[in-house]
């Protein structure tokens, strides 16, 4: 297949502003190319991709991330929108005769409701759960137009859009390039928190866990909302939490791999949680709230622990049981199900079905 990948409009690839969708897109570009497909990426100006990747960089104003808006807040399309400009370029490319399908990564209504403007099929890989009334309507529009055209990363994510939508979408999970992650058998005692520094990611809960366990917590990710960090630091003055910034995959995996555990204390429905499989690939157990995709990834008692949502004491209690986890089992789970090749294979099969 000759595939056009439409990137997220919230930031350039490589900036970290797009969150997990950036890793997903990079992984699929490599994986699909390895399977013999031709991939062209359409992304905002300033995007960085792997060498030999064909990319069209498009200018325009970036969009506000959907997770920062209230559910009923109408989205604001900025003047000279980068998404509008990227979509215009995608529709032009679709008429060239050089492509077979569009793979949309943008969590925005435009590609979902305007897919008929393209001369080739459009497939949508939804990166987040239900966050707004408009996106719910947009996803429903696409699903009812073509029941095969929407895929999601987890069953929990699909259920967030309601049972009818959940029954009509394809679940493809996710994957990573295992060669980029070193397995580390002997960790130190620190905990890791890897996420955008924002309210829905549970920054306050992370500080609370650091206080309860008395362990050092290293936080990695884009500083999206400094006030959330400052509020948590004031509330938990005895927490030893070190902000390590947004790191490249190579540096992050080395730092993450030394951790005793990754904690995932999110307050929203994580669509999947790529960082969970990144941690597991390094041999790091994952302690997660039973909310969203991460709870489907973690094998409770084998690769980590799944605890009740919003229960920081349960997270701290799970830290005390980390000695029961064999780190090699964590790596094995990723090798079996979440490799780049396995993920690309699932997505390629789905795209072939959409294109029929």
Tell me what each language-model feature is.
Residues 1-356:
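Catalytic cores of nucleotide-sugar-dependent glycosyltransferases that transfer UDP/GDP/TDP-activated
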